[in-house]
């Protein structure tokens, strides 16, 4: 075997090629007049006599000169080890064509791509004078026609990209040529082009969409067109922010791997696309910058940030989601020591001896329920405690999965103790309302009583049996009533008052405890604050704020801190798959070898159907339901070499038939049990259809005389 390599000291470089400048944040400068100097550079006949020899540079020094005590970056190159690239590569996944062009000022042409996208342009030119300088600038939105924006109306809005210049400069050579940057990327819907005398045809302006998500692994569709657009917005924000690392946003001078964002979105991500290697790479980045005391960073790579426990918990939740979705313990094994060190850090460094409360300082972070509309009314220690208990629950299960029985027992005991502490500290036993702890001494014992304060302990199974029904009722009340924001704005019933953290769990908490009607009302609410409010305002991606833009108030004064491509509020996507479609993992069988089908039709009747699929490692799982003439029709597909546990709403097995046949006589269907208005069946591989009276989706509802459920199936 011959191994052919080159000596690095024999490498050469040419410093005056057409790419004069390239930066992810600032854009690219390309001088096409320099192209002849490097034409044919990779051929044997090319004359490289003018090229210079490369020389070795030590990997030392600092990554950034910026200094911020609240964002302690891993800033020293020393100790860094170069490794081979792994994860999911960035590639072109789509190509868009501009829909329209407007000359907003003389010589200033703005093209609308019709979709907020992430990538680079591909612009065809001809007949340009050599040396002509063409400038491209990129924006997600334009200034609307409102009095406060007089003088800028119709121009692209660049305030929200802050210190990122995000522009490309192209110096033309003449003839047929193409502008297509290689050493940058942009988040944008609108392209401003200057330096040309007249507008280019819209078909000459393309958008090359880049992503580490190469294709979707799922689909979701309903009778509600706005909900369908919301799902599309979630997918586009996933495309745009899964770019080598899971970023918070793709356009401004940030584009960082904020851990809180991927923590709340990881379950949705695993259903949207096949991302195990992408997330495994990110967990490597989190370990690389884990502090010596065990604290996970709030940003990875590089580290730093000021998010706190809820952000650091990504180091626990993401491995768990990957394990459950893909059934592979490899990530658990390589990440386990880091997770255990993190738990020990919480115990040693954040639990106050005198009060037993988890206490955080600004040096670690206190973002809490970021951008929640009632966040200032919350007891932050309640949220921190709930997440710590959730982390302990996951660690118990992951330790057991790895056969670490003594660790699992330790985590289980600690989980039980902290769960008991939560119920005694944060729940008023008579009313079941959440209350302030001694974290804020002058408020101790006063009610918190906001959505997030109930959502987290319910979603995480923290509330004990004595308090549970009262806490559920209190959560329901916070959803049904009008609420007032921290800034004094009155919001209508069925408003989404939660931030990044609470929003990820609110629909699950409602559906887990029989409040599906409220979950669907929240999903389909169009008034502010809600998921569909942004859809009503023309959004094509998920926004950082629920009101990043409105037709009446423009940007509401949030011009700078305002991303229009931020997937965190899109974490509701997991509920769409897990509850609306009912495609759920079976925790006892990670990876969908065995799984659960538990669809929950809309009890309000506003949504008439939902259907979709998830492409598991074993094949496509399909689920759907539709309401028609007083009946709910269900359809499922179970892929080969798997089995599904189906929870079908019906009063008893006697009411479930295949045509006129009893279920016990149907091939591919096995009876498991019944109760609480549900019949539980085991489905072998095949396609199935069932129908039940509309009343049945409300679990526990009594069957009226003469009502039956019918089924048809093939396997």
Feature-to-residue mapping (PLM):
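Non-catalytic C-terminal accessory modules of carbohydrate-active enzymes
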Residues: 4-40, 81-89, 94, 144-146, ...
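C-terminal capping/lid segments that line or modulate ligand- or cofactor-binding pockets
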Residues: 30-32, 253-254, 272, 315, ...
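Active-site-proximal structural scaffolding
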Residues: 44-47, 116, 127, 163, ...
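Alpha-helical support elements that line or immediately flank enzyme active sites
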Residues: 120-140, 194, 259-289, 316-332, ...
């Amino acid at each position: 075997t011959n191994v052919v390599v080159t000596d690095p000291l024999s490498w050469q470089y040419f410093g005056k090629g057409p790419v004069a400048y390239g930066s992810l944040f600032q854009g690219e400068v390309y001088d096409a007049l320099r192209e002849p100097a490097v034409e044919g550079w990779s051929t044997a006949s090319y004359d490289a006599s003018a090229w210079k020899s490369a020389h070795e540079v030590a990997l030392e020094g600092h990554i950034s000169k910026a200094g911020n005590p609240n964002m302690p970056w891993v800033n020293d190159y020393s100790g860094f080890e170069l490794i081979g690239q792994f994860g999911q590569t960035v590639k072109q996944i789509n190509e868009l064509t501009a829909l329209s062009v407007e000359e907003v000022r003389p010589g200033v042409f703005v093209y609308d791509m019709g979709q907020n996208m992430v990538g680079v342009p591909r612009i065809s030119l001809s007949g340009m004078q050599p040396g002509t300088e063409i400038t491209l600038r990129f924006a997600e939105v334009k200034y609307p026609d409102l009095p406060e924006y007089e003088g800028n109306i119709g121009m692209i809005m660049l305030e929200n990209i802050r210190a990122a210049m995000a522009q490309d400069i192209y110096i033309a050579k003449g003839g047929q040529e193409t502008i297509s940057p290689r050493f940058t990327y942009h988040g944008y819907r609108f392209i401003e082009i200057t330096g040309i005398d007249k507008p280019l045809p819209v078909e000459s302006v393309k958008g090359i969409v880049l992503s580490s998500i190469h294709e979707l692994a799922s689909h979701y569709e309903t009778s509600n067109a706005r909900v369908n657009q919301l799902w599309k917005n979630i997918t586009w924000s996933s495309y745009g922010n899964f770019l080598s690392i899971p970023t918070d946003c793709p356009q401004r001078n940030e584009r960082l791997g904020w851990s809180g964002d991927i923590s709340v979105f990881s379950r949705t991500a695993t259903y949207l696309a096949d991302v195990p290697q992408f997330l495994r790479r990110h967990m490597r980045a989190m370990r690389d910058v884990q502090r010596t005391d065990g604290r996970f960073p709030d940003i990875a790579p590089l580290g730093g940030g000021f998010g706190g426990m809820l952000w650091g918990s990504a180091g626990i939740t993401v491995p768990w989601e990957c394990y459950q979705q893909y059934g592979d313990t490899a990530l658990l094994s390589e990440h386990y020591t880091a997770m255990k060190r993190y738990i020990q850090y919480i115990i040693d460094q954040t639990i106050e001896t005198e009060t037993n409360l988890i206490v955080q300082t600004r040096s670690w972070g206190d973002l809490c329920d970021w951008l929640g509309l009632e966040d200032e009314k919350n007891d932050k220690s309640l949220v921190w405690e709930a997440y710590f208990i959730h982390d302990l629950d996951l660690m118990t299960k992951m330790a057991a999965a790895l056969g670490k029985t003594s660790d699992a027992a330790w985590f289980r005991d600690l989980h039980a103790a902290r769960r008991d502490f939560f119920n005694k500290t944060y729940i008023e036993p008579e009313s079941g309302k959440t209350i302030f702890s001694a974290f804020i001494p002058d408020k101790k014992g006063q009610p918190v009583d906001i959505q997030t304060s109930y959502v987290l302990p319910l979603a995480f199974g923290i509330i004990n049996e004595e308090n549970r029904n009262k806490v559920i009722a209190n959560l329901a009340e916070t959803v049904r009533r009008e609420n007032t924001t921290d800034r004094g704005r009155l919001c209508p019933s069925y408003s989404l008052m939660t931030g990044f953290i609470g929003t990820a769990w609110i629909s699950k908490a409602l559906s887990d405890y029989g409040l599906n009607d409220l979950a669907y009302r929240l999903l389909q609410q169009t008034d502010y604050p809600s998921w569909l409010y942004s859809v009503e305002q023309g959004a094509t991606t998920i926004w950082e704020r629920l009101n990043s833009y409105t037709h009446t108030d423009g940007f509401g004064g949030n011009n700078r801190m305002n991303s229009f491509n931020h997937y965190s509020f899109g974490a509701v996507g997991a509920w769409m798959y897990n509850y609306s479609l009912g495609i759920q993992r079976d925790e006892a069988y990670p990876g969908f070898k065995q799984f659960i089908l538990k669809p929950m039709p809309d009890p309000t009747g506003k949504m008439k159907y939902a259907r979709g699929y998830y492409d598991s490692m074993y094949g496509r799982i399909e689920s759907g339901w539709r309401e028609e003439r007083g009946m709910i029709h269900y359809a499922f597909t179970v892929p080969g070499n798997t089995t599904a546990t189906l929870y079908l709403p019906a009063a008893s097995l006697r009411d479930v038939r295949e045509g006129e046949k009893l279920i016990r006589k149907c091939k591919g269907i096995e009876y498991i049990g019944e109760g609480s208005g549900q019949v539980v069946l085991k489905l072998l591989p095949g396609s199935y259809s069932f129908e039940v009276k509309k009343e049945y989706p409300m679990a526990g509802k009594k069957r009226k005389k003469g009502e039956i459920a019918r089924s048809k199936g093939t396997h």
